[in-house]
A protein has these predicted regions:
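Long, amphipathic, charge-rich alpha-helical segments that form helical bundles/coiled-coils
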Residues: 68, 75-117
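C-terminal amphipathic alpha-helix
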Residues: 98-144
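C-terminal motif of bacterial Sec signal peptides marking the signal peptidase cleavage site
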Residues: 16-19
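Bacterial N-terminal signal peptides that target proteins for export
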Residues: 1-8
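Post-signal peptide N-terminal segment of mature Sec-exported envelope proteins
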Residues: 27-49
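A structural signal for well-ordered alpha-helices, especially hydrophobic packing surfaces
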Residues: 40-43, 47, 68-75, 96-103, ...
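Bacterial signal peptide processing site
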Residues: 21-24
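Alpha-helical segments in soluble extracytoplasmic regions
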Residues: 48-86
Length: 144
């Protein structure tokens, strides 16, 4: 009977350990935070130019898309970082309506209306702010 109780206790402790492991969040990463703020500024400045011909800013667009690819690769290799990684993937997905999708449409249409740019920009900036805030809050969580 004591052996059965010990086995049950071990099983319960194992399940608790496994469930706690799945709730882990990556710790604060200064590089991730800094890159997110840099990408926010770059995105804001570049999106403001979308009322002009795409060809005039093709180099800057390529550079920004490269920065997105780099941060996705960086975030992919951090343990317990699924949420941040998914947020970056959504932002960099050319088939969605955030940053990479906006840049793709700019290339296809050559110029965007000022109204569209402002609306799209507010959504992109809000999405990047969510990433920045999530990363900043990791610092508080990891201290607890």
């Amino acid at each position: 009977m004591k052996k059965l109780q010990l086995i049950n206790l071990i099983v319960i402790i194992s399940f608790l350990f496994i469930s706690c492991e799945s709730l882990k969040t990556a710790t604060f990463d200064q590089h991730s935070y800094q890159k997110a703020t840099e990408i926010k500024v770059m995105s804001s400045q570049l999106m403001d130019q979308a009322t002009y011909p795409y060809n005039d800013y093709e180099k800057e667009v390529t550079n920004l898309l490269s920065e997105l690819d780099k941060i996705v690769e960086y975030e992919k290799n951090k343990p317990y970082n699924d949420i941040s990684l998914e947020m970056w993937k959504i932002l960099s997905d050319k088939e969605r309506n955030l940053l990479a999708g906006f840049l793709k449409r700019w290339k296809e249409q050559n110029k965007m209306s000022e109204v569209f740019v402002e609306q799209a920009k507010s959504q992109v900036i809000e999405a990047i702010d969510l990433i920045i805030n999530y990363e900043a809050n990791k610092s508080k969580e990891s201290k607890d």
